[in-house]
Amino acid sequence: MEYQEEASLASAEDSTFIASSPVQSVSEMKSIKQKSFQYFDDYEKNVSDKTIQFQKLQMTAKEIIDAFERDSTQRTLQIESLESKIGEQERDLNNEKLASETLREKTQLLEKENGALKVENGYLYEKSRKLEEEMAHLKKKCNVYKSKFEESSLRCKSLYSSNTKLKDSMETMKRRMETETKEMNKIKPKNDSESDRFKRNSQSLSQQSPLLDVHSPDNSNHRTMLNINNSSPIKPKKIFKPNEVKNRISRLQKTFADLENQHHSFQQICQTLRKRLENDSSTTKQRLSKLEEIIRNRAPPSYSFSLNCSHTYQPVSCVEPVNHDLS
């Protein structure tokens, strides 16, 4: 606009201009006008082109600025997200560092415990080896005691059978003595002179025939008494020796007492073994329980002797009255 105003002012007629030649000045003025118009047109074109270029450049710059702003905003967001990620990673690293320190401390403690467990394992291995040796020794002892127990059981059975036989023989002899005494009482003497003598003989026979040894030199009178009456049915078939029977019974009692003592000692040994093997393997406990069951099932019975002979004999010749109480 300023250029147009200047051009209009320049194109206005100047009243102060005095031309030397009117024709030349008019033509020159026209050419000058044309040139000035053309110049202004070119200038306006140039200005408009430059204005358009400037506007384009301005728009481009604005787009670039907007793009830069968008890019900077995006970059800012990315930076913020990266900063947050870095913060999270730092926290994770700190947590991992703490966890690694805790793990290292735990590892050190576990190494110490492992060393202590190795020492304890060696001690327990040595102890288990000693226990195995002791178990083998105890097993041998148990086998020995088992064999002894079986032998003692067999001895108990044999002694029980012999005791039964002895009781039967004693009862048989007692019944025989009673029968013979009754038969002797039923026999009548032939004359009065032999009556007293027969009574004495019968009394002596009832007292001494199953008990005295008629073959001994001290009992010669009794030998003559037995030979007086050959028709007498009383003949001693078996010599009864009370002292020998009593000694035999006492020996049996001692034997049974020894067997009971052995049985009690064996029970005590089994109790000791059970106390020792409380913390041992189940196999040994099963064997020990089997031994205890064998002891319970095969315990020797308690034998009691009740052989009593309380018959009092009448004194004959030099024989003193004897009270045989075999208890």
Swiss-Prot record:
Has a role in meiotic nuclear oscillation and recombination. Required to remodel astral microtubules into the 'horsetail' astral array maintaining the 'horsetail' nuclear movement. Promotes homologous paring of chromosomes during this movement. Residues 175-234 are annotated as: Disordered. The lineage of its organism: Eukaryota, Fungi, Dikarya, Ascomycota, Taphrinomycotina. GO terms for cellular component: cytoplasm; meiotic spindle pole body; nucleus. Interacts with alp4, kms1 and mbo1. Residues 175-199 have a biased composition (Basic and acidic residues). Residues 202-212 have a biased composition (Low complexity). This is Meiotic coiled-coil protein 6. It comes from Schizosaccharomyces pombe (strain 972 / ATCC 24843) (Fission yeast). Residues 66-188, 243-297 form a coiled coil. One of its GO terms (molecular function) is identical protein binding. Residues 217-232 have a biased composition (Polar residues). It is found in: Nucleus; Cytoplasm, Cytoskeleton, Microtubule organizing center, Spindle pole body. One of its GO terms (biological process) is homologous chromosome pairing at meiosis. Keywords: Coiled coil, Cytoplasm, Cytoskeleton, Meiosis, Nucleus.
